[in-house]
């Protein structure tokens, strides 16, 4: 389990005046374990849109590390990814695409939908794997690219203090996420790429990405 970092506060500050609903972020609280959590309003906003669920009915477990299954499901739901625009001769099975994703699990459809919509999931991804900050950030940016003009945006590289620790497969998407304010560095410029990401931090990052998409829709 991981506690929230102070960079979460910075990320939240960039979007406090925005809302997924067009109204105030404040809404009737559903979860009972968010009282002292940075990102409480963002989590509740995602819940009220039907994008995320708790571990139990009124329990989000914000400080728990998010698993691959939970993270992929959050991204698919939040970005409303689907297979509607893809034609298949035969419907794909998880076992055709992954080695560790079962064909009949609660998360099965999310993994299939995510990878076929361009989210860079590895074939050997383990649904129980605890996601790191760099992994989840990369997944979010790939989902965001589906409905935005990100490939056309010129990004000025950001100086990341622990940039040499980044997996080269994720460094580009992390640069985008930091540059666009979807995630932030801590006050010393560290990203902490290998650190496990909490469910609260993952939700805040997802919220920020949706707010960016709302403010910068794809241009025809």
Which functions belong to the PLM regions below?
Residues 43-46, 114, 174-177:
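A short amphipathic alpha-helical interaction element
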Residues 109:
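Conserved active-site-adjacent core of cysteine acyl-enzyme catalytic domains
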